[in-house]
């Protein structure tokens, strides 16, 4: 039975939670890695994994579903043009959550969430971007 296996409320109203996860999903699609608290990262997996699965099949209906959930045109374009084809041969497990200690102010457990097959950044490219 699935009694009590609901989602984490994270001390927010349902509309705030929806907006927060929508913003976090757009950030993860755009930057391919984000830093957040561990409970938010674990809950974000439930939002982002089905979106990436939608992105693997670029039909008009899937694009409309993704836009209804994300409300960000650039993120939807990147989802279907880059991220979906990248994970074409992977059946789920598109994200990785790495624990990274505790936040200074309130000791909240922090996590680094990233897409699994994220392209590596060379040291020379990173130096060029920093300058």
Swiss-Prot record:
GO terms for cellular component: cytosolic large ribosomal subunit. Keywords: Ribonucleoprotein, Ribosomal protein. The keyword Nucleus does not apply. PROSITE patterns: RIBOSOMAL_L17. PANTHER family: LARGE RIBOSOMAL SUBUNIT PROTEIN BL17M, RIBOSOMAL PROTEIN L17. Belongs to the bacterial ribosomal protein bL17 family. Part of the 50S ribosomal subunit. Contacts protein L32. NCBIfam families: L17. This is Large ribosomal subunit protein bL17. The gene is rplQ.
């Amino acid at each position: 039975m699935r009694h009590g296996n609901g989602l984490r409320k994270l001390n927010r109203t349902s509309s705030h939670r929806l907006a927060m996860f929508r913003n976090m999903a757009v950030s993860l699609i755009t930057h391919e890695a984000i830093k957040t608290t561990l409970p938010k990262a674990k809950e974000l997996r439930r939002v982002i994994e089905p979106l990436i699965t939608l992105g693997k099949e670029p039909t008009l209906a899937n694009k409309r579903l993704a836009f209804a959930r994300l409300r960000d045109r650039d993120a939807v374009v990147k989802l279907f043009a880059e991220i979906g084809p990248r994970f074409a041969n992977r059946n789920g497990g598109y994200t990785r959550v790495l624990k990274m200690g505790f936040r200074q102010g309130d000791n909240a457990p922090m996590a680094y969430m990233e897409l699994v097959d994220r392209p590596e950044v060379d040291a020379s490219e990173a130096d060029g971007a920093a300058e």
